[in-house]
A protein has these predicted regions:
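A short alpha-helical cap/connector motif
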Residues: 1-130
Length: 130
């Protein structure tokens, strides 16, 4: 029974994401990534990494699903970066730049983060946010 409920929850999220995308694509409303970007720019927090993360987390928890690592797994990511102290990190997929911020604030000055993003839209938005 738990698996059926979980599957229903996942289907509900999936359907909501499709509807949200179609409505945004039609121009009826903004894409959620545009809304998050606008929040960051409107609140003038571009140079405040923690405030950017807090804004994205708040949006993801209280408004709608975002496909980023989030605050709980983000802490694990940061702890691993501190523990391993890597010289290079390859990030596949940037989306809003959330993980990029978490990674960059934990790298030493000699380390390198290389991020690859297939979507021009996500790339441009992450450049505005990070």
């Amino acid at each position: 029974m738990k698996n059926i409920i979980r599957l229903f929850d996942l289907l509900n999220i999936f359907i909501k994401e499709i509807v949200d995308y179609l409505v945004s694509y039609s121009g009826i409303k903004k894409f959620k990534v545009d809304i998050v970007r606008d929040l960051v720019l409107k609140n003038n927090i571009k140079n405040n990494p923690q405030a950017i993360l807090d804004t994205i987390d708040d949006f993801g928890w209280n408004r709608t699903f975002l496909m980023n690592i989030g605050d709980e797994k983000g802490v694990i990511l940061e702890e691993e970066i501190k523990r391993k102290n890597p010289k290079q990190i390859l990030e596949l997929g940037v989306y809003l730049g959330y993980s990029s911020i978490r990674i960059l604030r934990n790298l030493n000055s000699e380390s390198l983060l290389t991020s690859i993003e297939a979507s021009n839209k996500y790339f441009e938005i992450s450049q505005e946010i990070v």
